[in-house]
Design a protein with these regions (language model features):
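Conserved active-site and SAM-binding loop architecture
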Residues: 1-245
Length: 245
């Protein structure tokens, strides 16, 4: 589905296939930039913390394999905040320390991520400019200017509504499953408008705004897949900032 979204917006993109099957022979010319973000679930402090033992984490090593083989001029690897020892292990492999950037500096959501990159002066420029960037509120991203939240528990339903005057919580790939009362993705079962006592979800367009993706960028696939792609993706303006350094 992400390929469908990419080709709709950039039809000349060359899809080279599964990273596990790629070798240097698949890239006849030199590579200027290698960007990756291996699945974060294995590393996340919110998950089971299987780290390198999680089957999904193997794609990190596929990224490293290609990075060593292709020797790109620059690289960026993104992932979630994780245990310090795992973070240190990744840093030792890549030879650089990560830079923590919260998407709240560039958008209306709190999304703390680690970025390993050899692009120079990113940390220095972030320190110099971060105070000027956090101007976008969650409220400005929403169509109705209200962030309505509810959690529905069997036999004990309760609803909460609060204005979105600050940053929205982090968008994840599982967003479509629901939102808890504190704004974190959860497993609320009923969706609808607030007037009927149910939850109002952020629309795909509002989620695109959270990720600083152009409105309508993910159109053309089912709504579930739009949420999935946006939750798994980068905050565009964060990557743009890194590349501008």
């Amino acid at each position: 589905h992400c390929i469908t979204i990419t080709q709709k917006n950039y039809p000349s993109t060359i899809q080279v296939g599964n990273i596990c099957d790629l070798t240097k022979a698949d890239f006849p010319s030199e590579i200027d930039l290698l960007v990756g973000g291996s699945p974060c679930q294995g590393f996340s402090l919110m998950g089971r913390q299987l780290n390198f033992d999680d089957s999904r984490s193997k794609l990190f090593f596929e990224y490293v394999r290609l990075w060593k083989s292709l020797k790109p001029k620059y690289f960026i690897l993104e992932n979630v905040k994780m245990r310090q020892d795992i973070q240190d292990a990744i840093s030792a492999i890549l030879g650089v320390q990560p830079i923590e950037i919260n998407s709240a500096l560039f958008s209306g959501q709190n999304r703390r991520r680690l970025y390993w990159t050899n692009i120079p002066k990113v940390a220095e420029k972030l320190t110099q400019t971060s105070g000027q960037l956090s101007l976008i509120t969650g409220k400005s991203l929403l169509s109705d200017q209200t962030y309505e939240i509810a959690t529905v528990r069997k036999g004990n339903p309760r609803q909460i509504v609060k204005p979105a005057t600050d940053k929205l919580p982090c968008l994840t790939a599982s967003y479509y499953k629901g939102i808890n009362a504190d704004g974190r993705p959860g497993k609320a079962k009923s969706f609808g408008d607030y007037e009927r006592g149910k939850i109002e979800m952020l629309s795909p367009v509002e989620c695109e705004r959270m990720q600083t993706v152009p409105e309508g960028y993910t159109e053309g696939v089912a709504k579930t897949h739009r949420y999935n792609a946006l939750g798994n993706g980068f905050t565009v303006d964060v990557i743009a900032f890194i590349l501008s350094c």
